[in-house]
């Protein structure tokens, strides 16, 4: 995708060397935005092969409200293993905040259910927001949320989503995040009777780890190929009824996978 290659070039050309929590070191910039028109194809990177199974199962895991890696491991997904404790627990991470946010008065709020109801009944609302940044529980999380807040917007029968990501690993994380939130937007559009609009990806600290520079430069030498298409295998009326088998990716023809170490 041209938008992704432009992001890589921007960070390499304008970023500054910074230390970071992991000790790896980064080239970092602050503030950047990409836009993807979902009618033009499913924005899954073609300059390297992505593991769609991991993207889809992680999103389904979030939507279940699950915070234990057991479900992921049972489905061949290992992307959260490094942060889990000996029992597979991660603390109140994304799934917990999306589905059972704990308010100050002890009330539990299902943000996803509330969001979908609001899209159906009050599509012009400016409060179509889900937040994973629960300040009162951050210290209990294995990893504070990187993609921490997203908002929906309905216009002309189309549903658009804007994500704010406070911290973005350009090589490993960002390609997953793009595809994940594009998929979520398409799923919510489907169950609310809307068409997919745009996915808008807004970054805070967007960085390339020092040990990923070679891989990023390799991607920049590769041509951008046509985007794949994503469709659903059946009609589904609830966001919580989707299964992995419902996602059909067509015409995905990426360049080969590129390995890169995760900084923990």
Curated annotation (Swiss-Prot):
It holds the Pfam family Thymidylat_synt. DUMP binds at residues 21, 126-127, 166-169, 177, 207-209. It is an enzyme of class 2 (transferase). One of its GO terms (biological process) is dTTP biosynthetic process. (6R)-5,10-methylene-5,6,7,8-tetrahydrofolate binds at residues 51, 169, 263. One of its GO terms (molecular function) is thymidylate synthase activity. InterPro entries: Thymidate_synth/dCMP_Mease, Thymidate_synth/dCMP_Mease_dom, Thymidate_synth/dCMP_Mease_sf, Thymidylate_synthase, Thymidylate_synthase_AS. The active site is at residue 146. Its main location: cytoplasm. It is found in: Cytoplasm. The keyword Cytoplasm applies. It catalyses: dUMP + (6R)-5,10-methylene-5,6,7,8-tetrahydrofolate = 7,8-dihydrofolate + dTMP. The keyword Methyltransferase applies. Its EC number is 2.1.1.45. Pathway: Pyrimidine metabolism; dTTP biosynthesis. Homodimer. Belongs to the thymidylate synthase family. Bacterial-type ThyA subfamily. Catalyzes the reductive methylation of 2'-deoxyuridine-5'-monophosphate (dUMP) to 2'-deoxythymidine-5'-monophosphate (dTMP) while utilizing 5,10-methylenetetrahydrofolate (mTHF) as the methyl donor and reductant in the reaction, yielding dihydrofolate (DHF) as a by-product. This enzymatic reaction provides an intracellular de novo source of dTMP, an essential precursor for DNA biosynthesis. This is Thymidylate synthase 2.
